[in-house]
Amino acid sequence: MTKIAVAKGDGIGPEIMDAVLSIFDAAQVPLQYEVVEMGRWVFDKGFSNGMTPEAQQTIESLGILFKGPMETPKGKGVKSVNVTARKTWNTYANKRSFQTLHGVNTVFSQANIPIDLTIVRENIEDTYGGIEHMLTHDVALCRRFITRPGSRQVLRYAFEVAKQKGAKRITCGHKANIMKITDGLFLEEFYNIAKEYPELKADDVIVDDLCMKLVTRPDLFDVVVLTNLQGDIVSDLCAGLVGGLGFAPSANIGDDISIFEAVHGTAPDIAGKNIANPTALLLSGIGMLRHLGLLEQAVTIENALLYTLESGVHTGDFGDKSTPSVNTTEFANAIISNFGKLPANNPRATQTNEPVTITMRQLAGNPMLETAAEAALSIRGADLFIASNEQPQVVADKLQQHLGGIFKLVTISNRGTQVWPKGSIYTNLINQYRVRFETADASNTSQQEIINLMQRVSADFIICSSELLNYMGDKALYSLAQGQ
C-alpha cells in the first residue's frame, strides 16, 4: 500500500482535509497517510521555510505531498511556504484543469458554453525566484529568469498532457512582443518541442489577447502553457470562469516529488465552523489518485461528486440560495452516499487500477540542468547600472573619460528608454541609468577588462549592478534600449 505525506494546512485546511480523507476511506482508497508539520504555526516556531526538518525528510522519502491551504505570516520577511515547497522539490509544472460543473452556476453554464480547459504553468522560474534589490532609494529591481532547460521541462510536460487528454490544440501564451529574449526563448522552445507532436495543432497568442479571448470564448481553448507569473494570473482567471477557486484543482508535478493542493485561501473567518467547501481539495485529490494509477477509486469518487453537485447539494458559498446549504461533513457524506451513481452530464468511464510505484532517485549531488551551446560565448562589452540624478549629457561627459582606449559609450537609457545620444526632453527620469559600453572595434574583450572599466567608472558613480554583453558566435545575447 502506497504511503503519502499529508499536510492539513491552516484555517479551514484541517476540516476540508478530514472531509476529503473520509471520502477516500469510504471509497477504500489503498493509501496510508503520514501527517507532516507545515504552515503558519511552523513559521511561528522559528522554521523560516514553513516546514519542520522532519516534514521535509518525510516528503523527500515518500515523493507525494497532499496539502491543504497554508498561510504565510505577513510582514515578517519570510517566503511563502507554498512557493518554497514547489521550488525546493523542483515541481516544474503546475497543472490546473477547469471544467463546467453542473450545479455550479456561472455565466458560461447559463449560456450553455461548455468549458474543458487545462492550464500548464511553469512553476520554478520567472520573477518567482524572488531575487529583488533596491538599487537606489527610488529604484527596485526584480530579476526574471527564463532558462532553456526549465522551459523544455514544462513544455514537454504540457505536450504530454495534451496528448493524454486527447486534445487537438495546444497554445502558448506569452509576451514575446515585448520581452523578446526571455519570453522569446520560451516561445522558441515551444515550437521546437511541437515538432515532436505533429498530431497536435500548436499555436501561440499574446497573453493580454489570451485573457480577452478566455473571458469571451473559453471553449475555444484546450491546453494552454505559460511562464510562471503569466500562468499564475491566467489560471486564477480561468478559475473564475468555472465558479471560483473553490472548484479549481491544482497539481505541482516534478520528476521526483509531486504536490497536490487546493490553491484557495485559508479563510480564517470561517475556520472551525465546519462550513467550508472541500470541492477544490477533493478534485486535487482525485488528480493525485490518477497520478498514482488508482483510476478505479478516482472514477468512483469523481462521478459521485458530479452527481452530488447536479443534485443541488451545496455548501453555503455556491448553489441555489433558495435551498438549504449543508456543512462540510454533510457535503462529504452526500458524496459517499452517491458512490456508484452516474451524473447525467459527462460521466467518467470506469477504469482499472494501474498502480504506480514511487521510487525516489538516490542522488549524489544536485542535478545540473544544461543544454549544449551552439557556439562559444564571447564578451563584447557591458551594461552598467549607475546611480545618478544628473542630466544624461552630464553623465555621458563623465563616462567618456573612463573608456580607457578599449570601449565606446554606445547608449544611456533610463527605465529602458534611450536618453543619450538621442532622446526626448519630455522623457521623465529616475535616479538610475543603464549605460552601455561596447568594444570600440567590435572585438572580444575579457572579464578583467570589464572589471577595470568598472573600477574607473566607480570614481564618479555608484555602480548598482552590471551585466556582460555576450555574443554566441555572431548573435548578440542582449536587447536594445527602447528607441535605440
What are these regions (language model features)?
Residues 30-53, 212-214:
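N-terminal beta-loop-helix "entrance" segment that forms/cooperates
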Residues 54, 130-133, 139-172, 176-179, ...:
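Glycine-rich phosphate/pyrophosphate-binding loop and the adjoining helix
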Residues 340, 344-484:
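C-terminal non-catalytic interaction/assembly regions of soluble proteins
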Residues 44, 95, 102-103, 216-300, ...:
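Glycine-rich phosphate/nucleotide-binding loop
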Residues 5-28, 136-208:
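Glycine-rich phosphate/diphosphate-binding loop of Rossmann-like nucleotide-binding domains
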Residues 10-13, 63, 120, 158, ...:
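Buried hydrophobic positions in well-ordered alpha/beta secondary-structure cores of metabolic enzymes
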Residues 44-141, 229, 233:
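N-terminal glycine-rich phosphate/adenylate-binding segment common to multiple enzyme folds
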Residues 20, 24, 190, 281-289, ...:
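Buried hydrophobic packing segments
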